[in-house]
């Protein structure tokens, strides 16, 4: 029988006086309410300890939700939670934005109203919660659903927005703000709509700074890409590990903007796939950024900017509005690029000053041209005082036949050595460019 969560609770010393039907659940507290234990109904309506769900450690609060403005119940629990407390949400939870609190957000980001304000070193845990649904019954700017204080945790949450009150055009709240050393782990954030707020500090659905974002699923987001008003997902000095970003889409391609902005962060073992945001950019910045062992797959996006150290990633079946850019003094090594299409640009990879592009495998790359009569030059790699060595560059049959195709265009300060290409020429190398050991017409 499926468990239905009900608001039965009391002292453990009185638990045997409670009638608890099979499929029901209750919480029993110690006399001083510093400890709690979960009981379920037995087949004779007597309470029995829940196997594997006994909670006897101190500093735990259980909130039983009933679907009616559950933010009030959770706010009450969070307000009395001391450092080290875990607040457990139970049942099917429904949040509204009719009851918000001042988040006390630090200067520089302005004022936010939080629906759930998780304090310093407090954890909000959805282990016993079937789902959390947000209803946008009081639309207003500068709202955030989960505000995490320093060293706060958000864990095991299954969240989605109600698609009758949150729409593609309504003013919607930011989902998450994570402060320094906050942790977001094992959460599902699904069916989310853009905030639709034209401000650089509130144009984000997720904003994390100095925190950890691990083992989460982002699924089914409807976005509106924007110019200079933030990023849909913004990570600054964040450890972003083992997450899945999937089925992100848009109905508004009028402007280009950052789908994901990752600054001075570690971005590793993530999967980004099956998304269609044709003018949404993935943007890395900061020379200490690290992007490795990720998969970017089967998506139609704007462009990708790489910074810091990018290694051992797989980029496969991507339709790009423009190129992949490698920022100055950045390293892009040992990656696989398979089946990339550049739809509007005339360059596939743009290497910044003193960038290194080495040991990469590029196969079946296409530059899409709309006018076959147009006299225009095309570059696979453009190197501006860059180091380009030991790459395999295999083009699609159509791209291989383009007029004025330069596999590598490099200026006099660049180094181009040991590359292999299917094209008949290595490209256009300025006098003074160091060029050695390159192989052409390879098949």
Residue ranges and their predicted role:
Residues 1-25, 33, 45-52:
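Extracellular/surface-exposed low-complexity repeats and stalk/linker segments enriched in Gly/Pro
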Residues 17-39, 77, 87:
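Short hydrophobic/aromatic-rich beta-strand motifs
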Residues 138-140, 150-271, 276-282, 287:
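Right-handed parallel beta-helix
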Residues 404-443:
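Leucine-rich solenoid repeat scaffolds
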Residues 84-92, 126-132, 152, 157, ...:
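Extracellular beta-strand-rich, repetitive "passenger/adhesive" scaffolds
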Residues 65-72, 94-97, 107-114, 121-173, ...:
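Right-handed parallel beta-helix/beta-spiral solenoid domain characteristic of secreted/periplasmic
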Residues 59-90, 94-100:
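Acidic Gly/Asp/Thr-rich repetitive segments characteristic of extracellular carbohydrate-active
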């Amino acid at each position: 029988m499926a468990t239905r969560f009900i608001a039965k609770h009391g002292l453990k010393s009185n638990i045997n006086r409670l009638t608890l039907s099979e499929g029901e659940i209750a919480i029993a507290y110690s006399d001083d309410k510093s400890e709690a234990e979960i009981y379920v109904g037995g087949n004779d309506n007597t309470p029995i300890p829940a196997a594997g769900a006994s909670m006897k450690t101190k500093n735990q609060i259980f909130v039983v939700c009933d679907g009616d403005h559950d933010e009030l119940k959770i706010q009450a629990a969070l307000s009395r939670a001391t450092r080290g407390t875990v607040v457990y949400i139970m049942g099917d939870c429904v949040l509204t934005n009719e009851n918000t609190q001042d988040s006390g957000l630090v200067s520089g980001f302005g004022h936010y109203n939080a629906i759930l304000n998780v304090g310093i070193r407090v954890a909000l845990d959805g282990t016993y919660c079937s789902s959390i649904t947000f209803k946008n019954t009081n639309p207003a700017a500068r709202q955030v659903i989960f505000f995490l204080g320093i060293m706060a945790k958000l864990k095991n949450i299954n969240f989605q927005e109600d698609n009758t009150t949150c729409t593609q055009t309504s003013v919607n709240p930011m989902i998450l703000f994570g402060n320094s050393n906050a942790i977001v782990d094992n959460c599902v954030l699904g069916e989310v709509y853009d905030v639709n707020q034209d401000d650089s500090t509130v144009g984000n659905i997720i904003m994390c700074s100095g925190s950890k974002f691990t083992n989460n699923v982002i699924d089914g987001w409807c976005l509106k890409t924007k110019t200079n008003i933030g990023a849909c997902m913004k990570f600054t000095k964040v450890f972003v590990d083992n997450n899945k970003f999937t089925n992100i889409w848009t109905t508004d391609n009028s402007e280009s903007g950052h789908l994901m902005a990752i600054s001075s962060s570690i971005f590793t073992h993530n999967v980004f796939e099956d998304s269609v945001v044709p003018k949404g950019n993935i943007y890395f910045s900061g020379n200490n950024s690290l992007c490795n062992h990720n998969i970017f797959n089967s998506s139609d996006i704007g462009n990708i900017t790489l910074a810091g150290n990018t290694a051992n990633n797989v980029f496969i079946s991507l339709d790009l509005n423009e190129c992949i850019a490698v920022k100055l003094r950045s390293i892009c090594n040992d990656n696989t690029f398979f089946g990339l299409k550049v739809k509007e640009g005339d360059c596939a990879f743009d290497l910044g000053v003193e960038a290194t592009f080495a040991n990469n495998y590029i196969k079946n790359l296409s530059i899409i041209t709309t006018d076959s009569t147009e006299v225009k030059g095309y570059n696979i790699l453009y190197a501006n005082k860059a180091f380009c060595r030991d790459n395999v560059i295999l083009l699609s049959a159509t791209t291989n036949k383009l007029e004025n195709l330069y596999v590598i265009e490099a200026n006099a300060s660049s180094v181009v050595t040991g590359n292999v290409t299917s094209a008949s020429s290595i490209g256009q190398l300025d006098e003074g460019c160091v060029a050695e050991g390159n192989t052409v017409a390879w098949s």
